[in-house]
Amino acid sequence: MSTKNAKPKKEAQRRPSRKAKVKATLGEFDLRDYRNVEVLKRFLSETGKILPRRRTGLSAKEQRILAKTIKRARILGLLPFTEKLVRK
């Protein structure tokens, strides 16, 4: 067997490093804390709807965490499902 026709070995490909996990915090507040009603109210509209990402400025992952937290607080009775209808 001759070594002239031997194919060169491929170098081992490195797997790209994973992105760091997003910490669901807003300053000193944890977005997963469903008992912190004052912080969660900042992300609700006047009628009680969850504000969209473009208004809150959160990442997609943080917005999903926030939505789960608000829904959990609503089920436990800490936040209302709806507010009074605001008429202008």
From Swiss-Prot:
It comes from Thermus thermophilus (strain ATCC 27634 / DSM 579 / HB8). Gene3D superfamilies: Ribosomal protein S18. HAMAP family: Ribosomal_bS18 (MF_00270). The keyword Methyltransferase does not apply. One of its GO terms (cellular component) is ribosome. Belongs to the bacterial ribosomal protein bS18 family. NCBIfam families: S18 (TIGR00165). Part of the 30S ribosomal subunit. Forms a tight heterodimer with protein bS6, also interacts with protein uS11. Binds to the C-terminus of IF3 and to the central section of Era. InterPro entries: Ribosomal_bS18, Ribosomal_bS18_CS, Ribosomal_bS18_sf. Located on the back of the platform of the 30S subunit where it stabilizes the close packing of several RNA helices of the 16S rRNA. Forms part of the Shine-Dalgarno cleft in the 70S ribosome, where it probably interacts with the Shine-Dalgarno helix. Residues 1-22 are annotated as: Disordered. One of its GO terms (biological process) is translation. GO terms for molecular function: small ribosomal subunit rRNA binding; structural constituent of ribosome. This is Small ribosomal subunit protein bS18. Keywords: Ribonucleoprotein, Ribosomal protein, RNA-binding, rRNA-binding.
